Amino acid sequence: MKRLNTLVLYISFLILIISIVAGCGTGKEAEIKKSFEKTLSMYPIKNLEDLYDKEGYRDDEFDKNDKGTWTISSEMAIQKKGEALNIKGMVLKLNRNTRSAKGFYYVNAIKKDENGRPQDKQIEYPVKMIDNKIIPTKDIKDEKIKKEIENFKFFAQYGNFKDLTKYKGGDISYNPEAPIYSAKYQLTNDDYNVKQLRKRYDIPTNKAPKLLLKGSGNLDGSSIGYKKIEFTFVEKKGENTYFTANLHFKPSNDE
């Protein structure tokens, strides 16, 4: 009987520990979602010039007269089996002090040389934004590139995370020392954002992606940090397909 009671106590204790750990994981997942909602609730930002009037979190790094700068980026990377990793994307900085935006569109093809070292061949095309339109600041002879810039849309302009709270069972990671945190979810091809990506990019796989929400800074938003979104369709040696997007607020550099 003693042995049975001891076993029952041990099992009860084990169940309690598992419940506490699971509860902590669920609580941290909710905190991470809440942290991202502060940024993702702005999506879709159809007119990027609206960011000139949106305030982000300010800490003591900001000068009192600095209204801050929003940096927005989107990038698609595709590597078919045995080929180079082809990357196309854009970065745009929207300065709230000057109400002006400039950045660059870029293309890159990364392949390894005979010694296995990656060779980076990124080409950048400077751009600016006027009346919510992206315009090259230098003459571009390549008509295909010109068209890509003309038609480019940032993920923040069409992405929608109104159903973020419905994502369940995420793989949660949290390091309070850094602090950095992330939540990863397996999506389906019926997900709204997945459909939008397939509509805009020639994605060479029917596999549904995993969504990674990765951030830095205090979870309660009381510090400056980044918020990164990544959709990974394929991830293996010599073959990759992923999309990344970012939107963050930081002090301006008006030099």
Swiss-Prot record:
A lipid is attached at residue 24 (N-palmitoyl cysteine). NCBIfam families: SA_tandem_lipo (TIGR01742). This is Uncharacterized lipoprotein SA0094. A lipid is attached at residue 24 (S-diacylglycerol cysteine). It is found in: Cell membrane. It holds the Pfam family DUF576. Disulfide bonds: none annotated. InterPro entries: Csa, Csa_sf. The keyword Transcription regulation does not apply. GO terms for cellular component: plasma membrane. Its main location: membrane. Belongs to the staphylococcal tandem lipoprotein family. Residues 1-23 form the signal peptide. It is a lipid-anchor. Keywords: Cell membrane, Lipoprotein, Membrane, Palmitate, Signal.
